[in-house]
């Protein structure tokens, strides 16, 4: 509606493709985002706002992936029309990896609107999974935060306030294969609304039988 706020949630996973394909084959392209943004502004008008918000993988170089995906050109395109397309990197931290080892960390500005702790409690599938939270592993070496936020009845996630406070979120995933889930679609794409992915259990320590 007029004056509303719309968030576009693309998949900007990484600034490179670890496989043999191009970067464009693993990220949501700006040409697709532009068309959706056009319709978003038709809905909210010039008094409304349209935001691209994403939390790519922790080692992703935002400036590079933004260039590959055409985000910078998209911002310029709407600026020529007198419209400000906001772009938010939801991550609180970026890391440098060498051979899979973290060798450096950079604190990022994060979500300018802040974050909200969302506790799913018993509504989380983890609550009845029978899994030992002490064996949960997230996106970093330290298992502490992952276990802490998924124990004693808690199942907490640090979610972007930009996303939660918007009037509408339009999920714009990239259709591609995934080594764990088979395919990456809209549900998997929502991993990127988490400000700290170490709150999100990615793995469980142990062998397959355990």
Region spans (language model):
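N-terminal and secondary-structure boundary signal
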Residues: 1-210
């Amino acid at each position: 509606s007029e004056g509303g706020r719309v968030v576009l949630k693309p998949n900007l996973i990484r600034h490179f493709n670890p496989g043999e394909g191009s970067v464009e084959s693993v990220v949501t392209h700006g040409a697709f985002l532009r068309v959706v943004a056009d319709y978003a502004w038709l809905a909210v008008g010039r008094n409304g706002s349209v935001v691209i918000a994403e939390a790519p993988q922790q080692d992703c170089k935002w400036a590079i992936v933004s260039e590959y995906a055409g985000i910078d050109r998209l911002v310029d395109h709407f600026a020529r029309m007198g419209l400000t397309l906001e772009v938010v990197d939801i991550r609180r931290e970026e890391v440098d990896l060498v051979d899979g080892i973290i060798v450096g960390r950079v604190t990022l500005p994060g979500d300018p609107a802040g974050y909200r702790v969302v506790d799913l409690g018993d509504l989380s599938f983890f609550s009845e999974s029978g899994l030992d939270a002490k064996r949960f592993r997230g996106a970093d070496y330290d298992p502490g935060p992952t276990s802490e936020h998924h124990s004693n009845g808690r199942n907490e996630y640090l979610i972007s306030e930009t996303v939660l406070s918007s009037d509408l979120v339009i999920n714009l995933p990239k259709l591609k294969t995934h080594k764990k889930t088979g395919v990456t679609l809209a549900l998997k794409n929502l991993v990127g609304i988490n400000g700290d992915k170490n709150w999100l259990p990615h793995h469980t320590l142990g062998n397959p039988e355990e």
